[in-house]
Amino acid sequence: MKKKALIITGRLAQDHEFIYPFYRLKEENYEVFTAVKEKKIVLGYFGTKIPPQKDDKIISTDDISEKDFDLLILPGGVKAMEHIRLDKKVIECIKEFDKKNKTIGAICSATMLLISADIVKNRKVSGYYAWKDDINNAGGIFTDQP
């Protein structure tokens, strides 16, 4: 049985921060699901279709549940994160992944979502350098290491 990966993203996400993990997970034989609030293809900051093909698996963030997936990827993009972090269902899903000790990969500005989910306390967290104060103020330990 294939492992399942969930990528939560939205309009104006950083294209490369979505595309790279999307295809790497497929190369590793994961079944990849993209969760977007509107449950439709959106455009990244540079105009890339997210997800790239109309037959890629896409679900609404209203329908996500940690129990259906093995790992979670959160691509960055400040404009996307500003909206996604207000989605209570997304924040609850992140908390559930954390409670079950499942892998969460947050890229660049997606550390905002980890802060909103209140899961950075006493943990080393890397991300975009502009979020250093936010990470530290949330009780995390900012690091510039991957």
What are these model-derived regions, one by one?
Residues 44-52:
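Acidic/histidine-rich helix-loop elements
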Residues 3-41, 53-146:
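Active-site-adjacent pocket-lining segments in enzyme domains
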